[in-house]
Structures are given as structure tokens and as C-alpha cells.
């Protein structure tokens, strides 16, 4: 089992798919990495030898920001926006959409579960 960037690659998957299990690597980056290392993207992860795993590990660690470092960079970026109190930072703080989407209806994913407010009862005549 190949272990790259602290993640065990799934054995039975093709290398181009297995690499996407690493946070920060998608399909296009996975193909790019395969091309740089000269390993066939269709090769199964279980068929990689130590030399190929070391090549992959070396390229990923030197050229790409992945896993924990990427997560912390994103968190720091969001924290900076919140600290300088810009519009995007305020929207992050309130848990609302950032990019101009409507919030009167929709935006449920960002706002969370509905919070019902009791209606005022109409006075009986």
C-alpha cells in the first residue's frame, strides 16, 4: 500500500483516481503528476514499486501544497478576512453566502437548518 502525504492510496484504483484521495489533488493535477513522473495514469496503485512511490512522493511534496498545509492556509485566509472585517469576512462570520447570492429564499446549505419563528396570533373578533 502506497503512502503519500500521510494518506494511504486505495490499492485497487487506477493511479489517476487514487491520487485524488489526497486533499488538494484533483483529476487534472493527478494526470499532471503522472506525466511528470512518467508513470502511466491507468496503472493500479497496488502495482507501484518503491521507486515509483518515491518519485510521486518527491514531486507532490516539492511542487504542491496538499493536505494539512493546504487546510491551514485556507483557514488562515478566512481568518484574515474575518480579522480585517471586510464584507467577505463579515459574511463568513455570519455564516451567509459570500458571492452575492440571494438569501431571502434558498442559501439553506450555508445558513443551516430552518429556525422557525412563532407567528403572532390574529385577535379573535
From Swiss-Prot:
InterPro entries, alphabetically? Rbsml_uS13_C, Ribosomal_uS13, Ribosomal_uS13-like_H2TH, Ribosomal_uS13_bac-type, Ribosomal_uS13_CS
Reading the lineage from the top rank, the first entry is Bacteria
Disulfide bond as a keyword of this entry, yes or no, is: no
Q: List, in alphabetical order, the Gene Ontology terms for molecular function in this entry.
A: rRNA binding; structural constituent of ribosome; tRNA binding
Q: Which GO terms describe its biological process?
A: translation
Would you identify the family this protein belongs to, as annotated? Belongs to the universal ribosomal protein uS13 family.
The subunit structure is:
Part of the 30S ribosomal subunit. Forms a loose heterodimer with protein S19. Forms two bridges to the 50S subunit in the 70S ribosome.
Its name, as the record gives it, is Small ribosomal subunit protein uS13
